[in-house]
Every structure is written in C-alpha cells, then in structure tokens.
Amino acid sequence: MKLSFSLVFNALTLLLQVCIFAQARFSNETDMQALLEFKSQVSENNKREVLASWNHSSPFCNWIGVTCGRRRERVISLNLGGFKLTGVISPSIGNLSFLRLLNLADNSFGSTIPQKVGRLFRLQYLNMSYNLLEGRIPSSLSNCSRLSTVDLSSNHLGHGVPSELGSLSKLAILDLSKNNLTGNFPASLGNLTSLQKLDFAYNQMRGEIPDEVARLTQMVFFQIALNSFSGGFPPALYNISSLESLSLADNSFSGNLRADFGYLLPNLRRLLLGTNQFTGAIPKTLANISSLERFDISSNYLSGSIPLSFGKLRNLWWLGIRNNSLGNNSSSGLEFIGAVANCTQLEYLDVGYNRLGGELPASIANLSTTLTSLFLGQNLISGTIPHDIGNLVSLQELSLETNMLSGELPVSFGKLLNLQVVDLYSNAISGEIPSYFGNMTRLQKLHLNSNSFHGRIPQSLGRCRYLLDLWMDTNRLNGTIPQEILQIPSLAYIDLSNNFLTGHFPEEVGKLELLVGLGASYNKLSGKMPQAIGGCLSMEFLFMQGNSFDGAIPDISRLVSLKNVDFSNNNLSGRIPRYLASLPSLRNLNLSMNKFEGRVPTTGVFRNATAVSVFGNTNICGGVREMQLKPCIVQASPRKRKPLSVRKKVVSGICIGIASLLLIIIVASLCWFMKRKKKNNASDGNPSDSTTLGMFHEKVSYEELHSATSRFSSTNLIGSGNFGNVFKGLLGPENKLVAVKVLNLLKHGATKSFMAECETFKGIRHRNLVKLITVCSSLDSEGNDFRALVYEFMPKGSLDMWLQLEDLERVNDHSRSLTPAEKLNIAIDVASALEYLHVHCHDPVAHCDIKPSNILLDDDLTAHVSDFGLAQLLYKYDRESFLNQFSSAGVRGTIGYAAPEYGMGGQPSIQGDVYSFGILLLEMFSGKKPTDESFAGDYNLHSYTKSILSGCTSSGGSNAIDEGLRLVLQVGIKCSEEYPRDRMRTDEAVRELISIRSKFFSSKTTITESPRDAPQSSPQEWMLNTDMHTM
C-alpha cells in the first residue's frame, strides 16, 4: 500500500512538471510569435539589419533588442530605440504580457498607437518619442498601472490628453511635448501625486491650468510652453515649492506676478515666462531664488524698473527681459547694469526693446568676462560707448542699435575679437570706421548703417571671411569702394547706399556667388556698371539708382532670382534689354530718368505698367498701353525713287529746316523738363518706389482710378489735406466703395508723404487703423507723375464732422450726436491703435498728426486712425529730414494738437502722439477746441480743463456718468502734460479708459440708447455746470 501511494505521488509530480513545461513552452511560443508579427510590419533603413537575427535559427531571447527574464524566459524588455525602423506598430505587441520596458524611440513608425498596448499591465517604461505616430493617445494606457515613465513626445498625435491617465498613480515622467494635442489640461492629472516631470510644450492646448495641479507636490519639471493656455499665472503652481524648472512661455497668460513669487518658489533654477501678456512689475523677491540660473520674461507688458536685487543671483547665466515697457524713459533705467555686474556667471543679457533711458554707464565694462551676448538695442540710451568696453573679451553678439548713442567708437572696442554680430545701426555714432573691425575675423553681421560715420571704408574688412551682412548705408562715407570687401566669398547682403562714394564700382563683385542683395544707391558712383555683376547668381535685390552710371545695362540675364531692380536716376543709355522680360522672378523694375532709347518690351514684367517705371527716357517708344508711350515708327524699306525737281528740292529743304528747328525746340524743352524733374526728385529725397511699394501685390492704374472717381469729379470730393485731395470712388468689377487720396506732387514734401504712408503700412495691421487697400504710382493722361493711395471707405466720416455743430448736416444720421459712451469707445479705439503703433509694431511708428479729422468712423462708429503721410518709423529716424522736409503745418504739428517739443525742433516720438491724443480726448469731452479764441499764451485747453477739475471732488458729479467723465478728462490731462517724461503711456491710457468704461459706462442704457430715449448730461453740459460752479 505504501509502495502504491509512492508510485501515484511520483506519477502526479511528473505529470505536473510536464504540464508546467508545456505551458511555459506555449507561453514562450506566444512571445516569439508576437515578435515575429511585429517584425513582419517593420522595415529597416540602415545597413545593420538588426532584425535579421529575428528568426527560428536562434532563441528569441538572444535576438537583438530583446531581453528575457531568467526564471520564465519571457520577454521583459523590447529596446529598439534609434534603429531607424519604419512601418507600423503591430497590435501583437500587446501579447508580450511580461513586458516591463518598451522603447521604440527615434524611429519612423507611423499610423496609430495600438489600443492593445493597454494589455501590458506589467509595463513600467514606455517610450515612443521621435516617430511619426498620429491619432489619439490610447486611453487603455490607464490599465498599465505600474507605468512610471510615458514619453510620446515628437510625434503627430492629436486630440486631447486622455483624462484616464490620471489613474496612473506611480507615474513620475509624462512627456507629450511636440505633438498636435488640443483641448484643456485634464484636472484628473492632479491625481498623479508621484509626478516629477510634466512636459506638454509645442502643442495646441488651451484653457486655464486647473487648481488640482497644486497636488503635484513632487513636481520638479513643469513645461507647457508654446500652447494657447490663458488666464492669470496659475495659482496652483505657487504651491509646488519643489519646482526647479518652470516654463510657461509662448502662451496667453496675463495679469501680475505675485510680489512674494521668490518666497513661494525658492528652488527654481529655470524660469521661462516669455511671450505672454503679463503686466505689472518684476517681483523683487526673485532675488530670493539663489539657485536661479536662467530667467526669461521677454515679450510681455511689464513696466517699472529692472530690480537691482538681480545682482544677488550669483548663479544666473541667462537674463532675458526683452520687449517690455521697462524703464519708463527714466535716466535711472540702466542702474541695474552695475548690480548684475555681480553675476559672475552671466553669459546672456537681453534688455532690448524697452524704454530704458539715460547714458550708457561705464559699469557695463564690469559685466562678467563670460558674457557672450549683450542686447541693449531699441531703447532710449544716450551717451558714448564706454572706453573699457574691451573688457568683455568673450562677447560674441553686441546689440546697441536704435538708441541715441554718439561719439566715436573707443579704441578698446578692437579687443572684442570674438564678436560675430555687431548691431550699432540707427544711432549718432561718428568718426571713421575703425580698421580694427578687420581683426574680428569671426564677424558674420556688421550693421553700422544710419549713423554719422565718415571717411573711407576700411580695406581691412576683407579679412572678415565669414561676413554675411555688411550694412553701411546712410552715413557720410566717401572715397572709392575697396575691392577687398567684394572678395569676401560668404557675403549675402551689402548695402552702401546714401553715402558719398565715388569712382567705379569694382568688377570683383562678380565673385560674390552667394550675394542676395546689393545696394549702392544715392552715391556719386560713375562709369559703367560692372559687367561681372552678371555672375552674382543668387541675386534677388539690386539697387543702383541715384548715381552717374553710364553706358548700357550689363548682362544680367542669368540672374533668374532677381525680384527688385532699380537703375533709375543715372545716365544709362542704349536699348532696354529684351531678356529683362524673361526673368521669371522679376516683380519691380525702375529704369526711369535715364537715356534709354528704342522699343519697350511688352511681355514678362513689362505687362504690368505699375511694376515698371520708365518715365524720363525721352527716346523710348512702344510698351503696353497703360505706359502711354509714343508708338514706335516702322521704317519703310528703301526703294528706287525718281530724282526731285528743283522746286521740290527747295520745298523739301524748307520743310527739313522747319522740322529741324521744331526738333531742337522739343529736345531743349525735354532736357529742361528732365533737369527740373531730377532736381525735384533730389529735393524730395525720393527713394525708389519699387522697394517701398513692393508689398502691394496688385496696384491699380491711373485709368482705373480716373474711372472709379468719375474723372476725379468735384461731386466725389470728400476731403482735402496738406498734400492732396480725397475722392470717393467705386473700384473694380465688384464696385467696392473706396477713398482715393490723390497727391499734389507740385507741393513740396508730397512725394515724401506718399512714401511715408507706404512705408508705415508695410507689415502693420490693426482693427483701428484705416486699411490701405492698394496704391498707384504711374503717369496721368498728360504724362505727369501721378501718386495715389486707395483706402477702405469710412461711411460715417471723420470725428471732426461729429464734433463740429456746423458740419452735423454732413453726417449720415444727423438727427443725433455722439453719446458719452460712444465717445469713450472712440477714444479707446484711437488709444488702442496708438498702443499698437508704439508698442507692438516691429518698428515703432510715431503718427505725428493725431487730430479729429484724421479719425474716421465706420458704420458701427468704430474709429480708424488715418493719414500716415507724416508718420515716422522711429527706428529709421532721420533728424535732418524731420526738421526740413515738412512745414510747420506738417509733422511739427497741426496747431493746437502738436506736442510743445515739436515747436522747438524736437524729434518725432511716441510721446508726441500721446500729447496729441490727450488734447483730442479733452476736446471730445469738454466741447472746446484747442484753438478756441479764449485760449492765449500759457492758457490752453490742458490748463483750462485742469483748473476746472481742480475745483471739483471725486463725488462732485451728479451721477456715475459725471464721475466717469471726470476720470476720462483726468486721463486727457495726464496725456497732455507739457514735458514728455510726465505723460501717461498709451498702454496705460488704454487700460485706464477701459476700466472707466466698465465701471461707469457698462449699462445697456448708457451704451446703446440714444439721448432721446435715455436723457443724460452731455460732457459739454457737465463741463459748463462745473465751470460755473467752480470759477
């Protein structure tokens, strides 16, 4: 019996082992089959053929990329990262039930992530980054409860982040960056209390960050940059004191940062908040974050000063505060430089595009010797470049452009031998260009344009063999162009325009095969244009106008990339080459004011009369009809003729004599006309239309505008200005209602007014700026120059029409006047337009002529600022041009609206616009014009309103409307202060007026009902009552 039991036990044990072995073999077969199915949908783009080992000749646990467990010999790791595999991820991968690590990163897998990945309940590490995956993130991943790392970054995944991921309680790293994810930030992710890294950057997510994020107390790295998140700075983040890296850049966050920011997040090493809408001041408590290494809050709306406490951040190596409103134009705006000199690790400092004023301090030379990038451009910095600037021996990028720097470059500047980029343009730096620039052999960009440099161009620049950009235009350089600079093989752009250079243009230019743009216009160059220029095969822009070049146009037929060419105002002769019509990219061609002869082509660019200018060439003919050139005479073939009689010979001689005399008179008249024309052009300083007008894709002809305005009929005349008349017209096949401003070119400065409007509208667009539809630069029916600008028509006329009682009959709806709320809306529109021009344009613009007649209203009474004929691009400012080109009724100001400093020769500025806006605001809400006869001497609209308000208290008004009007007038007073430094900024004015509107003018009755339906005191009545009460 005992023996029988032992036999049975052994038999059962053996049977169990056989079953286990069979089960293991079956499971192993399942893993192998899953791997082979995965391989079947994959191909390789490399020579290694790593999957070649995946076959039956060897155990699958020995296959490349496969790791098995020792006990069960099941696949626990599939690591194929970086093998350059293509194809799709097979759903069979979900059968590897013992898998703990799955790494398919850095391949080219496409299609979607299989839902069956959710079967891998033992999975701890999942990395499918840097592939071509698309579709949704599978919600089934929530079944993989042991996951600690999920990296799906750098794919094309879309839709939202699955809220189910919030159940992965062990997740430490979640990286979904660089995809196409949309939707909101899931509140359920607040359950991931083990999360240390979250990266959602480079997606399209939106909404606010939920408060549940505050529970992520283990978080070290939080990055959601380059999305569309909004709201204030997420309050939840203030609770995560463990944060070391925080990036919210390139979103739409707004509001102020808390003053105790640095106390709440003391462990930060990286803080990136750039390109949002944050306002207020930079928290001084940031100095408490002693570990801070990189801080960037560029491109926001911050104001105030740059904290001196930054000097305590000894680990700081990157400080970016570019493009804000810091400094307030104060002379103390640069004091922080002395403080950050204590940041001995500093490598990058960018405070450009702010309002930093005062002289450039000598302490700049005490900045860290590790500093490689220094950006102070686009501010209001004056003084000279300090003599010890050469101490910054590691400097690679130096940006001081568009300030008010003067004096000569110091000798020590030549010690900066590591410089690669030098931006000094648009200052008042003088002296000769130092030869030591030739020792900076790493230079790539040298921008010295728009200064007061004189003397010769140094030959030593030829040693800068890596130079890409060489900008020296708009200085006082003389002498010849050194051939050495035209032997720099890397040159892409060279601009020597607007100087006093003489001699021939060197033939060495033909060696610049990479040259894209060449400008040598408005110099004193002579001789023939270099024939070798035809070898610059990459050329797109060629400007040689305003010189004394003669002879024929060189052969540029191989320059197939040419877009803009200007050879005007020279002495070029011969025929216009036909191959110009065959250049496929040519969009603008100016050959005017030369001595060309013969037939003008009619194909290619010559088909468009508005893209080609040939006026001032007296011996040309043909061309398209719109050019209005004389027809070409076809010469008859010679034939045998009978001898003339004596009488016929006498008659013929007399006719020939008379014809010769007439010809002499005509030629003399044309020469006089050309000379006068050239003189007028020179006095106007007219640059090439082709470059400025290149932004308008479709220009209209004179004939089209002539027809659209019924031959510029007086019945269509809707306004007159300093430089011309404005007509109403119906343009194009759709009869679009437009306003056509025709310039009177006989009036001095009119051409510059035309160019100023074109230049200003290049690249700007705002709902409160009048829309410039197109332009016309052509000849009229009599062959005279014709310039016109075509705007969107504003049916409600100008604000001036509404403000003047004598013009009310011209308003469409003359039975009513503007309500206080409507006036406030208009004021906000104007202020918003100015804020855009002053702050948000790439090149800030000063309008220089804000007044009621330049504020146009559409059907909804939305205001549009118009008439940019006097506008100044502040970063291209030319003081002499400002002082001389316009009359006192021009840019120096319309009397009553112009800033006081303009009357003393001050330069155009955004502060001048603020003054004009303040006067406009006072006029709108006081009922008095700034030119009222009661004003004399120092007693003006500003002082009048100020004296009225000083006699009333904040509760002096009879109702909320009156209180609102009082606050509006206070804004007008702050904007129209005598001294620019005391005036309110446009962005402050916008915020203040919006706040007043929301508090005092937000009711439905106030905004929408007319005075007949909802009686209320007008601003004029309120001022009158207050005046009588207080005077």
UniProtKB/Swiss-Prot annotation:
According to the UniProt entry, what is the EC number of this protein?
2.7.11.1
Q: What class of enzyme is it?
A: transferase
- Which keywords, in A-to-Z order, does the entry hold? ATP-binding, Cell membrane, Glycoprotein, Kinase, Leucine-rich repeat, Membrane, Nucleotide-binding, Phosphoprotein, Plant defense, Receptor, Repeat, Serine/threonine-protein kinase, Signal, Transferase, Transmembrane, Transmembrane helix, Ubl conjugation
Matching entries from InterPro entries are given as: Kinase-like_dom_sf, Leu-rich_rpt, Leu-rich_rpt_typical-subtyp, LRR_dom_sf, LRR_N_plant-typ, LRR_R13L4/SHOC2-like, Plant_RL_S/T_kinase, Prot_kinase_dom
Q: Where is this region: Disordered?
A: 1005-1031
- Signal sequence coordinates: 1-24
Its transmembrane ranges are 654-674
Q: What is the name attached to this protein's record?
A: LRR receptor-like serine/threonine-protein kinase EFR
Species lineage? Eukaryota, Viridiplantae, Streptophyta, Embryophyta, Tracheophyta
